[in-house]
Each structure stands twice: as structure tokens, then as C-alpha cells.
Amino acid sequence: MEPVSRAVEETNRRMLRARDAMDRAYAQPLDVPALARIAHVSEAHFTRTFRATFGETPHRYLQRRRVERAMFLLRETDRSVTDICFEVGFGSPGTFSRTFRDIVGRSPRAYRREATTMPVPTCFTMAWLRPNA
């Protein structure tokens, strides 16, 4: 294997390690310094490489991950929007609603109303039923 290929492979492995940590601990406070430590790279290198690897910033990935989980909870539970907001890791209902609307295109409450009449694709449901291990 060429040295360049090994370097790229190692970089990908480090970025996947950080993304996996984000997937497991999405509801916890995560920041770039902590994620860079997980990937064993500098903060600037982490942000640049994560974006190049996954097509979005670490912050945006984490927001999207949290919103995806919130979508599931809004569809499948009757818990309040505020409870869901805090469970998925947002610090305030206002930030949650703005981010949700930005990503989904409607408010959490509107999504819940509409989601009760829409079928859920099996592949999406199965992704949320897998264990967190």
C-alpha cells in the first residue's frame, strides 16, 4: 500500500471515530476541541477534514443528527416538544425550533401534526431501532 493511501485511510478512520462518537453521544454537549481530541488531530485540521470527508461541518452534522432523533420522537411518542428538545441535546426550545425549521422546513409541532398521517419508510425506522453499541 502506498504511503498516501495509508495516510488517507488513517484520516478517514479518525473522522469516522469522531462521527461515531457524535452518533453515540449526540445529546451530550460536544464541541470541536473534544471531537478533535477523539480524532487525535488539531481543531482546525479536524474541522477542515470533517467537512471535506462528510460534506458538512461537525456542528451542522450534530444539529442534523439531533433533529433526526427529534423527528422520530415527535412521530412515535406523545412527549412534549420541550422535553424532546432537551432530550436530544438542545439548550433551549427557541434554538431547537429554529434549527428544526431550518432542517425540516416546518416547526416541530407542525411536523408532529403532519407525521401522524404520513407513512414512515421502513429503512428510516430500522435505523432508529438498532442498538447504540
Model-derived features with residue positions:
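Alpha-helical bundle regulatory/interaction domains
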Residues: M1-H45, A52-T53, T57, R69-A133
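Short, basic-rich loop-to-helix N-cap that marks the start of a DNA-contacting helix
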Residues: R60-R64
